């Protein structure tokens, strides 16, 4: 990979990993509501699911020419529906202001999110088909970069969770407002899938 291409790869992956998306918003919300330590299940579920999705993207990237557009479209709708459901759950979840302690989302719920998270699917397919496959079609490289993509995504999730933890007091004071803003950001993510 040339230095220019490598620079473009890092720019793309870091910007994509650090910008708002379902995982980062969920990580922020979980750490704000329950603290970083209590959010490790959420982060672990995201990380494992992310890795599996990146490996699946590696397989998909090998056969982009034969992907059925209807299947991709169906996946987009499923992802948007799940993201809107997640937004509703966040917007209506109890906060410390309400005097209630909401239960943190489970490992399996955050794991399942990855399989309908269109942002990370597009992230994986785009990175692999743009930066890796034109350079090499060696399976070891494609799998290795898929693992790297999952690690970069996990880094972004942890950064957002740490922000939620560090600003926990402020976010808890304005918990209802934060939940509504996060829910609206998720709805925006769902809409952006189609536009």
For each of these PLM feature ranges, what is it?
Residues 92-106:
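Flexible cytoplasmic inter-helical loops of multi-pass small-molecule transporters
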Residues 7-12, 81-84, 108-109, 148-149:
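Short alpha-helical transmembrane interface motifs in multi-pass membrane proteins
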């Amino acid at each position: 990979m040339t230095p220019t291409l490598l620079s473009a790869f890092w720019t793309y992956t870091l910007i994509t990993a650090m910008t708002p998306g379902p995982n980062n918003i969920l990580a922020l919300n979980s750490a704000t509501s329950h603290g970083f330590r209590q959010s490790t299940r959420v982060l672990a579920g995201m990380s494992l699911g992310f890795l599996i999705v990146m490996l699946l993207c590696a397989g998909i990237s090998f056969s982009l020419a034969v992907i059925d557009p209807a299947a991709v479209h169906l996946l987009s709708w499923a992802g948007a529906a799940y993201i809107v459901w997640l937004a509703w759950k966040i917007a209506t979840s109890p906060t410390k202001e309400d005097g209630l302690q909401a239960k943190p989302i489970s490992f399996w719920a955050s794991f399942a999110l990855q399989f309908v998270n269109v942002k990370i699917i597009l992230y994986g397919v785009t990175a692999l088909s743009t930066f890796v496959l034109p350079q090499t079609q060696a399976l070891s490289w494609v799998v290795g970069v898929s693992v790297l993509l999952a690690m970069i995504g996990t880094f972004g999730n942890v950064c957002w969770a740490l922000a939620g933890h560090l600003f926990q007091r402020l976010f808890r004071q304005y918990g209802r407002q934060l939940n509504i803003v996060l829910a609206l950001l998720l709805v925006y993510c769902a809409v952006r899938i189609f536009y």
